[in-house]
Regions:
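UBL (ubiquitin/ubiquitin-like) substrate-recognition surfaces
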Residues: 1-268
Length: 268
């Protein structure tokens, strides 16, 4: 381990020292809930989220949506998991999750069958967000002077549309923005589209490090042959390039590794 990595790890341990040697609680399987238990263990050890919930200010912002039941039941289960190191049966949380899933017509989470962990995580955090989302004021000022300013303006406008009516602390904590940039190789045509993201699904690079995976995810893609873009100004199809760029990252970045190919085979 390099000295930089050692220093970073020491800082991390010091920053979250109150969680040391605690939260080592197991969750009993209540019927094909391995995917759920794995997800809940990850959430349980997201210390920034724990600190936010420990303040309990979220309780003053709970709305009347059914999603609030998920957040409250999770907070109750989380406190039990951190009260002592033991084994707990998460029956109360499972019942609440299935009830809300039925109301929201998310049939896959209403029974006791295995499900995709990433999809379940997204469902849980959607419920968390919906529990305390509210309208806020957002003002964007200034005039774009450069290409970077124009990009910033598009991102801020997207954030305003996304945040103004339904803001919650979970957006800053878990949601970021990336930009899909398409550039023509035959004209000055450029299209920039900012998009919010909760989870980044990265391909596995031959070199197998996480940074290599991100390099592959953000690499330039050639758009030619059947994938040419249509330029409305020239009324022609043109060769182009496409690239994903990150504008802002969340406090906590959720990453999924694409371990399977389109044909269902597993990456080596």
């Amino acid at each position: 381990m390099s000295s930089e990595m050692e220093f970073s790890q020491k800082n991390k341990n010091s920053e979250f020292s109150e969680f040391k040697d605690m939260g080592l609680t197991g969750l009993a399987n209540v019927g094909n809930t391995c995917f759920m238990n794995s997800t809940l263990q990850c959430i349980s050890h997201t210390y920034e989220l724990n600190r936010f919930l420990d303040k309990e200010t979220y309780k003053t912002r709970l709305n009347k949506k059914h999603d609030s039941l998920i957040l409250c039941e999770w907070d109750n289960l989380r406190k039990l998991m951190w009260s002592e190191n033991c084994i707990i049966s998460p029956g109360g949380f499972v019942n609440a999750m299935q009830k809300v899933a039925r109301i929201k017509d998310r049939v896959i989470f209403t029974g006791f069958v295995q499900n995709d962990l990433t999809e379940f995580l997204s469902f849980i955090f959607d419920c968390f967000h919906n529990s305390i989302c509210r309208e806020v004021d957002m003002v964007i000022s200034g005039t774009a002077q450069t290409e970077t300013d124009e990009l910033a303006e598009k991102c801020y406008n997207m954030m305003k549309l996304m945040y103004k009516k339904e803001y919650s602390e979970f957006l800053n904590m878990f949601y970021g923005i990336f930009v899909s940039q398409i550039k023509s190789k035959e004209s000055s045509y450029t299209n920039i589209l900012p998009e919010p993201f909760f989870n980044i699904s990265v391909p596995i690079s031959p070199k197998k490090t996480l940074l290599d995976c991100f390099d592959l995810f953000t690499s330039i893609e050639e758009l030619g042959d059947d994938n040419k873009i249509f330029n409305e100004k020239t009324n022609k199809k043109e060769n182009a390039t496409k690239q994903i760029l990150f504008w802002s990252l969340p406090d906590i970045l959720v990453i999924t590794l694409k371990r399977f190919l389109n044909n269902g085979r597993k990456e080596k």
